Amino acid sequence: MSRSNQEALADFVADAPPGELNQVVEAISTVVDGNSSILSKLETDVHNKILDQCMVVSLGKSKSLVSKYNQLSKDTFYDSQSGQKFEFDFDTKKATPSGSHGSDSPIQGALDKYFSAHFPSEGAAGVFPQDDGSIALVLVDGKYNPANYWNGKWRSVYIFESGSLSGTIDVDVHYYEDGNVRLKSSEKVDLGSVSESDIVDAISKAEQQFQEKLNKSFNGLNEDSFKALRRQLPVTRSKINWGKSISNYRLGKDINVGGGRE
């Protein structure tokens, strides 16, 4: 396969909708007729996709994240909430506890409280100190309902460095029943100078503003753009006699086909 074709397949993986990575890889496998050489080259792209999207995994009775921010080695990660270290299988998408890892950030408790108050229970949030002295705060949650043809995900990542806080908020929603509609929204936020004790409050305000802006844009889209796509009924300015003359209209003829009322 040419380099351009391989890059195109990599783009498909990178743009896989939330909760649908396995289906995308299976579809590619079908298209290339199970070519092991092509599929092996995609492994790196799949791994990068998982790390970039900060995949949520089950770790015992709790949830944790698989991301570059809490990666200790190729397949080893840690959970900042429980202080556990775990191995992650990129093929089966399963996490297995493998020991303890010191994690005692005072920010974690405040972040957990905020996360549990504003997000459903299918996600996870973590505080991960980085080698360069910065701190990464990652919040990920999603709702997946393939039985009703829709999936959605929220991912926000913030970096606290030298007293300043900045980050990116991403929302990705896919609806695919009798069609294919996808909402993707991403916004970079610069929250400026923030004390460590005020980090979570700053995040809360930024995400509230983002959600309000997103709701406003969506309502405008529904009222204006989508409304313009609808077929408008013609204005005839003629009156309809809903009494004796109803049978003269096509609707009346259709109603009277059965010859009576049940």
Swiss-Prot record:
Lineage: superkingdom: Eukaryota
GO molecular function, one term: actin filament binding
SUPFAM superfamilies per UniProt: Subunits of heterodimeric actin filament capping protein Capz (SSF90096)
PROSITE patterns: F_ACTIN_CAPPING_A_1 (PS00748), F_ACTIN_CAPPING_A_2 (PS00749)
Localization (cell): Cytoplasm, Cytoskeleton
Gene3D superfamilies: F-actin capping protein, alpha subunit, F-actin capping protein, beta subunit
CC terms in the record's Gene Ontology section: actin cortical patch; cellular bud tip; cortical cytoskeleton; F-actin capping protein complex; incipient cellular bud site; mitotic actomyosin contractile ring
Protein family membership: Belongs to the F-actin-capping protein alpha subunit family.
Name of the protein in question: F-actin-capping protein subunit alpha
Gene name of this polypeptide: CAP1
